[in-house]
Amino acid sequence: VEWTDKERSIISDIFSHMDYDDIGPKALSRCLVVYPWTQRYFSGFGNLYNAEGIMSNANVAAHGIKVLHGLDRGMKNMDNIADAYTDLSTLHSEKLHVDPDNFKLLSDCITIVLAAKMGHAFTAETQGAFQKFLAAVVSALGKQYH
């Protein structure tokens, strides 16, 4: 992936202001509510029976924060995102057997929650850079499936 200086700056700025404790839980919760088939990977998380249960689930919140912090790896390795996620790709494909299409669904939910949080500051240019970044991460996470 080729990055312009402007894209690097946008990604860096997003992560320097990221509210992990707010955006992470909301993004994962949204994914589990909007795409209920993704819940099958979280059977040990307790109450996932309805939106209220998911949104108030401490395990979902904690994992959402963990997932969002996982994006730090890509931000710190923008010139080599694919290699930065080799171990996580292997884990999700070989041990957890996660459908790689779910990474895209979650990335869309992260984008929606971030856009809502940033408001007018989430310009088309910001969205373009952020979605390019997430697409690179999603591709890297799916690498071991091929």
From Swiss-Prot:
UniProt: heme b binding residues: H63, H92
Domain named Globin: residues: 2-146
GO biological-process terms attached to the record: hydrogen peroxide catabolic process
Protein name: Hemoglobin subunit beta-1/2
GO cellular component: blood microparticle; haptoglobin-hemoglobin complex; hemoglobin complex
More about this protein: This fish has three hemoglobins: Hb1 (major, about 65-70% of the total), Hb2 (about 5% of the total) and HbC (about 20-25% of the total). Hb1 and Hb2 display a very weak Bohr effect and no Root effect.
Free-text function comment from the UniProt entry: Involved in oxygen transport from gills to the various peripheral tissues.
GO molecular function, a single term: haptoglobin binding
One Pfam family it belongs to: Globin
Species name: Trematomus newnesi (Dusky notothen)
Keyword list, A-Z: Heme, Iron, Metal-binding, Oxygen transport, Transport
Family assignment from sequence similarity: Belongs to the globin family.
